[in-house]
Amino acid sequence: MLQVDNVFQTPSSQAAKARSKHREFEVEEGDLITYLNVFLAYASKLEEQGEEFCKHWCSTHFLKYKTLQRANQLLGRLRATLKRFGFSYQDRHKSMQATGDDVRRCIVSGLFPNAAYLHPSGVYRTVRGDIPLHIHPTSILYALKPATWVVYAELIQTTKLLMKDITVIEPSWLEVLAPHY
């Protein structure tokens, strides 16, 4: 989902309605798990009811159909690559067996260099370098009680550094998954 544009549409004339629909997918674990929820719902609708229904469903939920379609195409290419190299792919979106913690641990294993903790001053700081960071206003975590530890996928430089695509983590996961860090 990080390889495609933002999946959410927020037309200015229907901002409140769009925000309400988007909240159906949001979880306090962060943006990446929220994106996963959107994609799994899309994939389920596509498989169960077809492309035309899925287009309508995306429209009523203020989601970008073409962006989700592109993400699905990328998943198909990834599956083909796995198969070509002899790896089996277990389709888990039908009955998501992996827990949110399992998925977040996977995220930590890839994004551990982007770990940050909440400093007592109320500002996040990077584990390496102690650089001050803030949550981007588009993050679902922006309006929630700040999590103690997070990883982020992207930084945006404005007058301050803003974290985007954030996932809440447990600090013990860093010790296990990235002890070298």
Spans of features found by a protein language model:
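Second RecA-like catalytic domain
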Residues: 1-181
